[in-house]
Amino acid sequence: MKVLLVFDFDNTIIDDNSDTWIIQCAPDKKLPIELQDSYQKGLWTEFMGRVFKYLRDEGVKEEELKRAVTSLPFTSGMIELLSFLRMNKDRFDCIIISDSNSIFIDWVLEAAAFHDVFDTVFTNPASFDSTGRLTVRNCHTHACTRCPKNLCKNTVLGEFIDKQLQKGVRYTRIVYIGDGGNDVCPVTFLKKNDVAMPREGYTLHRTLDKMSQNLEPMASSIVVWSSGMEIISHLQFLIQM
């Protein structure tokens, strides 16, 4: 049986936030104050819809967005990690669950030739309309009260595991690699054999620290990382167990 690796994208695979990164395409590399102030908590996808409309209205073309997105730096050690996983696909299945969008993730993976490492990508579907505006739709609908309305990563992960079970695919354990607040929900549902891998110093790490101080039990083990090389070391340890 294989190990399932679940990756976040922004600030995990890449070392920045792809949505805020493309603001460099705007005039003076910033958004108008009224657009900045239009964000409402839990409605990030809707906010980005307004940002993409603004960029289109300002004459920013698809090629400019692509050039910006494909210049995003990978997180330290991540290229080595993805290369390691490519060489060990017989041991690992890899999926991405991200609140970015399908176009940005496709561009990054395609430019770095890492598409083949990932079995499935779950994210907000995106496309360019006839006017050249990038439109992003919600990933799904869900009933979770802890997550933004467009994406509950725990729901997505649970549905993926169920579908794999229906195909007769079982995993020895799940390793969840992420950084953000929306990674807390799926991580708290991991089981005893599983591993939560929060990026050091980021929201997920800080939240799990607080939970342990408040004696809120976590079933899974927690392994903090700051470089993909540390993740490789832990995966090598797991497959030798």
UniProtKB/Swiss-Prot annotation:
**PANTHER family tied to this protein:** PHOSPHATASE, ORPHAN 1, 2 (PTHR20889), PYRIDOXAL PHOSPHATE PHOSPHATASE PHOSPHO2 (PTHR20889:SF1)
Chain positions recorded as substrate binding sites: 19, 99
> What InterPro entries does this protein's entry cite?
HAD-like_sf, HAD_hydro_PyrdxlP_Pase-like, HAD_sf, Pase_PHOSPHO-typ
Q: Specify the protein name.
A: Pyridoxal phosphate phosphatase PHOSPHO2
The entry's active site is 8, 10
Q: Which organism is it from?
A: Rattus norvegicus
Record bears the keyword Magnesium: yes
Identify the NCBIfam families for this entry: DKMTPPase-SF (TIGR01489), HAD-SF-IB (TIGR01488)
Q: Which gene encodes it?
A: Phospho2
Quote the EC number: 3.1.3.74
Superkingdom is Eukaryota
What molecular function does GO assign, one term?
phosphatase activity
Q: Does the keyword Transmembrane apply?
A: no
The record's keywords, sorted A to Z, are: Hydrolase, Magnesium, Metal-binding, Pyridoxal phosphate
